[in-house]
Amino acid sequence: MSESIDINVYSQTTIPNAMAELMDNHNKMEQISAYCKSLYANGDAAQAYEQTQGYAKNALLNVAYHIQTVGTHITSLLQLQTNEMEKLNIEIQTLTQRVRMIHDSTGTNVFSNQDAAKPYKSSLKNRKVDTEATKAPVKYVHKPISYGISASDINQNGVPPPLNHSNSSANLTSSSGHLAASSTSNSSTPSYQSPSYSSQPTISSGTPPPIQKQPPRVGNAPPPPSLSVPAAPPPPVMNVPPPPPTSQRPSSVNNNAPSNDFPPPPPPSSSSSGGDLPPPPSFGLPPPPTLGDDFPPPPPPPVGSYDFPPPPARPQSQFYDHNDFPPPPPPM
């Protein structure tokens, strides 16, 4: 605060007063030079020279003094202004540093460089879609699926084209009349039901089974699919031996006994002591041959059949081998 007051005093009072004294001394030097000229004209020249020389020294000293005083005051004023500028510079730097710290802490440092250089590309942008060649998108039209087949859709061989959902709904830009006709034909198409059938065919004497009528076809609707009834599988064949003929059955069989393939058991023996059992019944088969001593001895083995050593024994492993298990039973 004191320096600011000093600056004001120097700039408003001290320096103007020093300049005024300098100008006053300059005016007095003009008066002294006019007085010295009059001495040379009216008086002694040697005395006038000495007085003029003394006045000139004093005038120069006064001028130098006043110039020095004014210069000193101006230098002091400039020094005060320099000090004040340094203080202002320090305060500005302090405020700038504080603002940067606040921007860094709050994340708003992007606003510090408002005059940042922007990169401009020298080449023009390559437009991928030309605005002149663009067309308006096709408006979506809800079109129901048409299952009808017209005469124009049948080819030369008389085979209708297969139904395809994508083909029937792909043309979205069809006329309104075709849409109305297709919607009318589809709304009147009945829902077909498959005819009921049974796995076992019913056989009636003399009367054929009734023929189920198909529902009438409306418009260009395709015929309903035909259902094929699979044939019933044949019964399995059991491996049961055929019964013996009636001629080989024993005559002791009662006619009132149930008809089966096996003879009845023999009657129990009348003797309680357990005598000889009756012989088994014969079914007309020849008796078995009797074993006797009439068979010839077996032929001797060929010579040299035992020249080879026996095969080595298979090593016993700690783990199971697939050869250790018995062979599987024959199929039934």
UniProtKB/Swiss-Prot annotation:
InterPro entries: ABI (IPR028457). The keyword Cell division applies. The keyword Protease does not apply. Residues 248-257 have a biased composition (Polar residues). Transmembrane segments: none annotated. One of its GO terms (cellular component) is lamellipodium. Residues 152-332 are annotated as: Disordered. Disruption phenotype: Cells show no developmental defects, mild motility defects and serious defects in cytokinesis. Residues 164-206 have a biased composition (Low complexity). Keywords: Cell cycle, Cell division, Coiled coil. Residues 73-104 form a coiled coil. It comes from the Eukaryota. GO terms for molecular function: signaling adaptor activity. One of its GO terms (biological process) is establishment of protein localization. Residues 221-247, 277-314 have a biased composition (Pro residues). Belongs to the ABI family. Part of a Scar/WAVE complex containing brk1, scrA, abiA, pirA and napA. Interacts with scrA. Involved in regulation of actin and microtubule organization. Required for proper cytokinesis. This is Abl interactor homolog. It comes from Dictyostelium discoideum (Social amoeba). The lineage of its organism: Eukaryota, Amoebozoa, Evosea, Eumycetozoa, Dictyostelia.
